[in-house]
């Protein structure tokens, strides 16, 4: 059985196609009590690694707060999480690996992304420009037009709010993309 590490995966949305197909999915998230900076070596061969680290220090939607986050240490903490995630890649040398984050300043630390997409490129009718870094096969697109559900745009903008629940909903991997990624990277 192939093992997939799914880091920063509270919802399980991105790893769901792998789990449904019978893969051994090791899902890790701080909200499940696992801080990847303190995760010990797993004595198993890892086939692939999915990584969706928190975007709050990097996303362009929060650019007005970047200076404050740089000054108070939140950016350093966020970069440390990226470093810890990439340590898994070096440790396990998987067949493929991918790190996801919305458009923002993460490219300052990781360089140019490997791929960029919107959920509507993979069958989910909304936009949220997302970047991917890593070594993986680019998923086959299944484009649909985005639906505008409010004057701000998609349901993502309509959510608003800063509660944990709305943040979780905004950060969930779109199911169309998750399935397309699985199909391209079995």
Predicted features and spans:
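Conserved active-site and SAM-binding loop architecture
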Residues: 1-186
């Amino acid at each position: 059985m192939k093992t997939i590490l799914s880091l920063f995966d509270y919802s399980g949305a991105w790893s769901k196609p792998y789990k449904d197909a019978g893969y051994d999915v090791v899902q890790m998230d701080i909200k499940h009590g696992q801080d990847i900076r303190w995760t010990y070596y797993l004595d198993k061969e890892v086939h692939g690694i999915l990584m969706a680290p928190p975007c709050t220090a990097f996303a362009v939607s929060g650019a007005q707060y970047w200076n404050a986050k740089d000054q108070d240490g939140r950016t350093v903490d966020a970069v440390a999480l990226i470093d810890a995630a990439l340590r898994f890649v070096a440790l396990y040398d998987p067949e493929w690996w991918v790190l996801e984050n919305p458009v923002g300043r993460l490219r300052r630390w990781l360089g140019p992304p490997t791929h960029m997409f919107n959920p509507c490129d993979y069958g989910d009718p909304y936009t949220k420009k997302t970047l991917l870094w890593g070594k993986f096969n680019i998923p086959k697109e299944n484009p649909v037009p985005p639906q505008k559900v409010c004057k701000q745009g998609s349901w993502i903008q309509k959510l608003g709010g800063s509660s944990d629940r709305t943040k979780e909903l905004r950060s969930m991997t779109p199911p169309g993309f998750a399935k397309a990624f699985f199909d391209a990277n079995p």
